[in-house]
From Swiss-Prot:
GO biological process, one term: translation
Xref: HAMAP family: Ribosomal_uS13
Localization of this protein: Plastid, Chloroplast
Subunit text: Part of the 30S ribosomal subunit.
UniProt biased composition (Basic residues): 100-123
Region listing for Disordered, in residue ranges: 99-123
Protein name (record): Small ribosomal subunit protein uS13c
Gene: rps13
UniProt key word S-adenosyl-L-methionine: no
Primary location group: plastid
NCBIfam families (UniProt xref): uS13_bact
Gene Ontology MF annotations: rRNA binding; structural constituent of ribosome
Entry GO CC: chloroplast; cytosol; small ribosomal subunit
Length: 123
């Protein structure tokens, strides 16, 4: 089964397979299956065409997923950077945005250490 350009693994249960879509986690997958009146224990390979069409239409109408969601997220970050607010400046400087300390740690966000040469001793 294919939803929003993503192939869902056929051997997995529907509840788990839906989490392969960017923007859908376990809780949202349960809500979607409940709204579409599908069993969470149903395997992807056992879903018939009518059920898959109902599921696909419900997801595409109600939720932003995959590339649409990624585009909205990147536009939000770009807007923060354009208006020059604190969060935008932190994004631009590739530093942690949510108040984490940077004196030690923050290596993932800041990248690998840049070694600075020490003072040379005169002999």
């Amino acid at each position: 089964m294919r939803i929003a350009g993503v192939d869902l693994p056929s051997q997995k249960k529907l509840e788990v397979a839906l989490t392969y879509l960017y923007g859908i986690g376990k809780t949202l997958a349960k809500e979607i299956l409940e709204a579409c009146q599908l069993s969470p224990d149903l395997r992807v390979r056992d879903v018939n065409d009518e059920q898959s069409m109902r599921l696909r239409q419900y997801i595409e109408q109600k939720y932003l997923i995959e590339s649409d969601l990624k585009r909205v997220e990147s536009m939000n970050i770009k807007r923060l950077m354009d208006i020059g607010c604190y969060r935008g400046r932190r994004h631009r400087a590739l530093l942690p945005v949510r108040g984490q300390r940077t004196r030690s740690n923050a290596r993932t966000r800041r990248g690998a250490k840049k070694t600075v040469a020490g003072k040379k001793l005169a002999k």
